[in-house]
Amino acid sequence: FDQIISKLAEDKNFVVAFNEVYPDGLNEKNITNAIQEFEKTLLTPNSRFDRYLKGQKDAITADEIAGYDLFKKYDCATCHVGEILGGQSYELIGVQHDYFADRQAEMTEEDNGRFKQTKAERDRHRFKVPGLRNIELTAPYFHDGSMATMDDAVRAMAKYQLGIDLPQP
């Protein structure tokens, strides 16, 4: 958590705003609580997508329907499940291709994923699957922030998890 605190502390405006809410400042407990409170705002029980799932076929656009069809076609719901479309399991990154070799960056402690907590070798490079509700608001993506856009993240997931190179739009 020291790396996270150091990174956050670099943004002086963030620190001022954070300290207004958490007077005892940046620490693991407060950061974890802030993330939990933020995640509560991501639930959208009556979104257009929810209405579509409940049978209102005109609630989303034709492009959005096509995207959802691809989501199902490529079995994204295998990991992105439940009301928030994820957040319920830890999965390995790089099932089909070596994400870390391709990234061409020095390995960090955070790259170990769940292993950092469990020390179980099976958890090395295993990360919590993010929920997809309001995901467009949470860039950059991946545990290391290496994917700047949703398009980058989707293409990377297709490559590293499924072994598929998605065509350009």
Segment roles from a protein language model:
Residues 1-169:
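Periplasmic c-type cytochrome electron-transfer domains
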